[in-house]
Structure formats: C-alpha cells, structure tokens
C-alpha cells in the first residue's frame, strides 16, 4: 500500500490500535512481532529467522517469547476484530487436546486470527526447518486443530470480523464500514 499500513487510520485509530483494543481484555501481554510500527505497552520482538519467511516465522517468534501457555495470533491490520471473538477462541483452546482454534468462513481458514497453544512451538520450528512457510499448510498437518465457523456470527459479521486491509480498496471499505 506504499507505506507502513499498521499506522493507517480507520475510524480515527491506527489499524494496530484496533487490534490492540480487541486483545487487551483477554491477553495478559501483547507481543508485536516484526514491523516498524510502535505500540505503547507492547513488547516488540523480531522474527528469529533471517530474511522474510512469512507469518509462520512470526508465529514461531511469538510462541517462543510468550510467557503464558495460550497465545492469540492476530494480523495487525484487522480493524473489526472483536474482544468477544478473541475471548471465545481462547476459551475454546482450553478444551481437551485442542492445540489451535481457527476461524473458518466462506470455505477459507483465517490462521492469523486464532488461538494457539504455546506447546505448538516445536512443531512450528520443525515445519519451518523443513521448508514449510504457509500457516495453513502447517495447520493441515497438525492434530488437535479446531475450526469454528457458524458460531462466528455471535460476534458480528464474519466478513468484517476477519477482514484484513491489504489494498486501497480494502482500506476504502474499512473506512466506510467504520463510519456506519
């Protein structure tokens, strides 16, 4: 989009602040992996792997740095992520042998909006060492992943809840929706 998108404002707040607000009630600590944007109160950590190895490497860094057994992973450009959804996914993570709880909407999983057990760290490291870069690919080969779909509607319009701002068109839509 031509500049650091996490600092772009939607509804009067930078994108990253929307995500921070959604996480702040359910998460003991906010970790910001990579990126050049600053977020007051967050602990900033770098990817542990050289080069740009994608979101799975960011998840690895976050899991490694986390001080608690359950971690919520969220992309920094989700202006409509809700506190209720974050809390719900983390709560579902505590059920039995579940190691990750991921939204699935319209046939597509959203692994950059999910709850992960810190115990997944060895599996993530191994997958990265073996050349896996895609989070979805990693999750497909992992036992104990739970996908949630219809229940997303309890927290709002799933299309908005899971929206990322990846283009000028997405930004225009987000600003329009935020103004409603």
Question: Which stretches of residues belong to each language-model region?
Answer:
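Nucleotide and nucleotide-moiety/phosphate-recognizing core
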Residues: 1-160, 172-179
């Amino acid at each position: 989009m031509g500049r650091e998108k996490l600092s772009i404002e939607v509804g009067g707040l930078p994108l990253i602040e929307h995500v921070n607000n959604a996480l702040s009630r359910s998460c003991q600590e906010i970790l910001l992996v990579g990126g050049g944007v600053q977020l007051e109160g967050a602990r900033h950590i770098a990817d542990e792997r050289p080069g740009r190895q994608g979101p799975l490497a960011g998840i690895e860094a976050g899991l490694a740095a986390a001080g608690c057994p359950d971690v919520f992973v969220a992309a920094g450009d989700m202006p409509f992520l809700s506190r209720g959804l974050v809390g719900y996914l983390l709560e579902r993570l505590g059920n039995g042998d579940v190691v990750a709880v991921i939204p699935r909407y319209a046939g597509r999983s959203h692994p950059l909006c999910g709850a992960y057990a810190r115990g997944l760290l060895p599996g993530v490291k191994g997958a990265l060492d073996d050349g896996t870069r895609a989070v979805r690919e990693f999750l497909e080969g992992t036992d104990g992943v739970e996908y949630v779909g219809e229940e997303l509607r309890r927290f709002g319009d799933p299309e908005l809840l899971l929206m990322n701002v990846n283009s000028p068109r997405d930004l225009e839509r987000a600003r329009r929706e935020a103004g409603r």
